[in-house]
Amino acid sequence: MDYFPMIFALLFVAFQGAPEAAVLGTELSAGAEDGGEKPAPATPWRPRRSKRCSCSSLMDKECVYFCHLDIIWVNTPEHVVPYGLGSPSRSKRSLKDFFPTKATVHRKRCQCASQTDKKCWNFCQAGKELRDQDSMEKAWNNQKRGKDCSKLGEKCLHQQLVAGRKTRRLEAISNSIKTSFRVAKLKAQLYRDKKVIYNRAH
């Protein structure tokens, strides 16, 4: 019998992994010469998310949408939610973040990563001004609601009447929605019960 083709095939398969084996052999021999110490494995590289700025509140969805550049935003019927690209590696925080001082009570909407980014700077500043304006308007509206409109005039009476109608209409709509949900739930339960009875009968 001629074993030459079979031996040749086995040698070919065995020597295909020869370069890797040679490299591994040199590493092992070098490790044995150094006293058997293995080099520490390098920490895996994790991609950092590119952030244009950091928001002072994560509840501010507009700010989060503006600042986080690589988040895919998914529209759901309820709200817009971020569809993240893995957990980002976070930088260490200073003690100032844990113990806020009195000066940091009136913070900006966000803090830009680059000081030369004018669009970001304008966005953060405009957000602060808008929030201040909204809070002033809310305070004025609350003050008007609390006061008697006889002193403020006809416009105040009209606004109170419109606001009252709106709230009553919204309450009626929410009540009808709740009722329709309850009815649908009862119908679904009745259908399930009928289906179970029908299956048991046959």
Curated annotation (Swiss-Prot):
Signal sequence segment: 1-25
The entry's keywords: Cleavage on pair of basic residues, Disulfide bond, Secreted, Signal, Vasoactive, Vasoconstrictor
GO terms for MF: cytokine activity; endothelin A receptor binding; endothelin B receptor binding; hormone activity
Subcellular location: Secreted
Pfam family, one: Endothelin
GO cellular component: cytoplasm; extracellular space
Region (Endothelin-like): 110-124
Chain residues in the propeptide: 26-50, 74-202
Cross-referenced InterPro entries: Endothelin, Endothelin_toxin_CS, Endothln-like_toxin
Disulfide cysteine pairs (residue numbers): C53-C67, C55-C63
Feature type site, description Cleavage: W73, V74
GO biological process, one term: positive regulation of urine volume
Similarity field: Belongs to the endothelin/sarafotoxin family.
Function: Endothelins are endothelium-derived vasoconstrictor peptides. Probable ligand for G-protein coupled receptors EDNRA and EDNRB which activates PTK2B, BCAR1, BCAR3 and, GTPases RAP1 and RHOA cascade in glomerular mesangial cells. Also binds the DEAR/FBXW7-AS1 receptor. Promotes mesenteric arterial wall remodeling via activation of ROCK signaling and subsequent colocalization of NFATC3 with F-actin filaments. NFATC3 then translocates to the nucleus where it subsequently promotes the transcription of the smooth muscle hypertrophy and differentiation marker ACTA2.
Protein name: Endothelin-1
Biological source species: Bos taurus (Bovine)
